[in-house]
Amino acid sequence: MLSVAARSGPFAPVLSATSRGVAGALRPLVQAAVPATSEPPVLDLKRPFLSRESLSGQAVRRPLVASVGLNVPASVCYSHTDVKVPDFCDYRRPEVLDSTKSSRESSEARKSFSYMVTAVTTVGVAYAAKNAVTQFVSSMSASADVLAMAKIEVKLSDIPEGKNMAFKWRGKPLFVRHRTQKEIEQEAAVELSQLRDPQHDLDRVKKPEWVILIGVCTHLGCVPIANAGDFGGYYCPCHGSHYDASGRIRLGPAPLNLEVPTYEFTSDDMVVVG
């Protein structure tokens, strides 16, 4: 306050700074000036001895506040009576509420309880994480209707010799052809040098009399017509691709042979595709 009053300029005549001492443990803001003297201080023997009772009599009886203004003294509050001391009894265990009792007697029980809670929590979190991962992985797998269409069984006795039967498998047409002996000998005699996509007939079949193909043209994905074309196999009317009875491209814009799916003969009269 003294520095404020000194720098106030024209308001200095109306400003005043006062320092009041309040009993407490803190130091005052402004130190009182002590006159310089060479004489030793004289003890006042008549001053009463400051005991606990005399100090309590000098203690502050009411709350102190700090105020600053014009032409008023400034005071500082060194005591806060509205501050509550924190009490953590609600967070402490009953075994350690008594401060006069040693906590070593109950340390084993408290540690065992903490370990048990930690173990149960870890198991629960691991189980929940396992379920979450399982559901996430299963959501990326194929649905039940797709799995049902993943494989198809074809009864071969329903397909007469020299005929081709079409099925729907995984959203695509599936051709199952029962070839005659003449077609088998004709396709086996084709030289690989004459083929755009060289592949021997025996490499495309497991049984010479049965040809199983995916009926999708390798040009632009059209569906060829069976028992048609210049080579008596399959013909795509969209752009004029000709395939033989083994599904090999012989003429037209298609670059590759018809695809052969994975299949297995479970018996002489049954084949499983997929």
Swiss-Prot record:
Q: Which organism is it from?
A: Colobus polykomos (Western black-and-white colobus monkey)
Report the family membership.
Belongs to the Rieske iron-sulfur protein family.
Tell me which residues bind [2Fe-2S] cluster.
C217, H219, C236, H239, S241
Quote additional remarks.
The Rieske protein is a high potential 2Fe-2S protein.
| Cofactor remark | Binds 1 [2Fe-2S] cluster per subunit. Fe-S cluster delivery to the Rieske protein is mediated by components of the iron sulfur (Fe-S) cluster assembly machinery that reside in the mitochondrial matrix (including HSC20 and LYRM7).
Catalytic reaction equation(s): a quinol + 2 Fe(III)-[cytochrome c](out) = a quinone + 2 Fe(II)-[cytochrome c](out) + 2 H(+)(out)
Instruction: Give the protein name, as stated in the record.
Output: Cytochrome b-c1 complex subunit Rieske, mitochondrial
Residues spanning the membrane? 104-140
Q: Does the keyword rRNA-binding apply?
A: no
**Which residue ranges does the record assign to the Rieske domain?**
187-272
Stretches of the chain forming a coiled coil according to its record: none
According to the UniProt record, one GO cellular component term is: mitochondrial inner membrane
Q: How does it sit in the membrane?
A: Single-pass membrane protein
Keyword Transport listed: yes
Give residue ranges on the Mitochondrial intermembrane side.
141-274
**PROSITE patterns xrefs:** RIESKE (PS51296)
Which residues lie toward the Mitochondrial matrix compartment? 79-103
Q: Where in the cell is it found?
A: Mitochondrion inner membrane
What CDD domains would the database entry show? Answer: Rieske_cytochrome_bc1
Q: What is its EC number?
A: 7.1.1.8
This protein's source sits in the domain of life called Eukaryota
